[in-house]
A protein has these predicted regions:
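Short, Lys/Arg-rich, polar N-terminal cytosolic tail immediately upstream
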Residues: 1-15
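Cytoplasmic membrane-interface segments at the C-terminal ends of transmembrane helices
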Residues: 8-12, 69-85, 127-137
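Membrane-water interface at the C-terminal end of transmembrane alpha helices
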Residues: 16-28, 121-137
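Internal alpha-helical transmembrane segments of multi-pass membrane proteins
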Residues: 17, 49, 65, 72, ...
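Hydrophobic alpha-helical transmembrane segments
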Residues: 18-22, 26, 57-61, 85-90, ...
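Transmembrane alpha-helical segments of multi-pass membrane transport proteins and ion-pumping complexes
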Residues: 28-37, 64-72, 97, 123-128
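A loop-to-helix transmembrane entry motif
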Residues: 48-63
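Membrane-helix boundary connector in multi-pass membrane proteins
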Residues: 98-114
Length: 137
């Protein structure tokens, strides 16, 4: 990682990083809850399991933690982490859509659309938190 002369790489302690990751999980889970409620109100099937809190909160936590691990690896090994995450994050979000498309039969367009939005919301909350507690430069 190259830094401008006089710049110092910012490193946060593990408790700060943990707090940021937990905050991202909470914020993303609340946003997911709003999306799930809106989708159910708009006609998504009531029995569509991915729109149940137990499902999306768990998967949100898994995604945010996995993203934090990936972010830490990118920070450590990439010569230009900003450039890498600029294409890597959107690519991974789009790839994460694939399993949701397989659920059209169960969730319909509204249910699956809500899931796709949830992926974007989780990624946005996570990247915001990672940039605060694990800056790339």
């Amino acid at each position: 990682m190259s830094l401008p002369s006089g710049a110092v790489a910012v490193r946060r302690g593990p408790l700060v990083v943990l707090g940021g990751v937990l905050a991202a999980i909470v914020v993303a889970s609340v946003a997911d809850a709003v999306l799930a409620l809106l989708a159910l109100a708009a006609g998504a099937p009531d029995d569509f399991e991915p729109l149940k809190a137990s499902s999306y909160i768990f998967l949100t936590a898994v995604g945010v933690v996995a993203g934090a691990v990936g972010w830490a690896i990118v920070r450590k090994v990439s010569k230009d982490p900003e450039a890498l995450v600029r294409w890597l994050v959107p690519t991974l979000v789009v790839v994460s859509f694939v399993p949701d498309f397989l659920l059209f039969g169960d969730g319909g367009a509204i249910g699956v659309g809500a899931l796709l939005l949830m992926h974007v919301v989780v990624a946005a909350a996570a990247v915001f938190a990672y940039r605060k507690v694990m800056p790339l430069s």
